Amino acid sequence: MARGLKKHLKRLNAPKHWMLDKLGGAFAPKPSSGPHKSRECLPLILILRNRLKYALTYREVVSILMQRHILVDGKIHFCIRLSDVVSIPKTNENFRLLYDTKGRFRLHSIRDEESKFKLCKVRSVQFGQKGIPYINTYDGRTIRYPDPLIKANDTIKLDLETNKITDFIKFDVGNVVMVTGGRNRGRVGVIKNREKHKGSFETIHVQDATGHEFATRLGNVFTIGKGTKPWVSLPKGKGIKLTILEEAKKRQAAAQTAATA
């Protein structure tokens, strides 16, 4: 008889975008996901131990976290997800969690100016008691009295110090987006058109910087900028997914330049 949530996670059942080796042990860290889905977040132990190499064991990670040296969106948290800002005041480092073109989590280093805000996708716009309007964001935030022009699927620019909306991006054709789900996760491009299907999912057609077009669901698209310029810096590759032939040519060119050097 099951009694509540499972308290353990086998390493073979962990999400692939965590990039854990199968022979590293029997278990993987069980995320304390909070408002997020457990498969869409990344435990801080994997960041400090596996990515940044600031700790060797789980106990060392716990001692670092208990000293409150790691901030997520300016606060103490133990799990992060897409677009969250990880700050380490002791080392003056700031990171933003993004996807690479293969759908894996990428810890992208950012400057201090960029670490003061984050982009949040609007899930819904509702009215509470006494007709007070509020919006729900993808990371579980509830913000009252938003701009009346903000609608569902738009993106807001949130100041992490004041928790107030400083600007917003409409979900319109011509704006740059990042795909956060499906087989095209991590790709960045501009919205070309929207296809509405009654009784089914709305399809979004996106074109990347190289001219390749692809389609995905409306729920998998996250607007990150107005026009073709994103409001946040992107990791290496700028969200452009190469084909198998293009990757082979790139490796050959790199090998030739290394041989001639």
Swiss-Prot record:
Gene source species: Prunus armeniaca
CDD domains named in the record: KOW_RPS4 (cd06087)
GO cellular component, one term: cytosolic small ribosomal subunit
GO-annotated molecular function: rRNA binding; structural constituent of ribosome
UniProt xrefs under Gene3D superfamilies: 2.30.30.30, 2.40.50.740, RNA-binding S4 domain (3.10.290.10)
Protein name (record): Small ribosomal subunit protein eS4
Gene name linked to the record: RPS4
Keywords: Cytoplasm, Ribonucleoprotein, Ribosomal protein, RNA-binding, rRNA-binding
Subcellular location: Cytoplasm
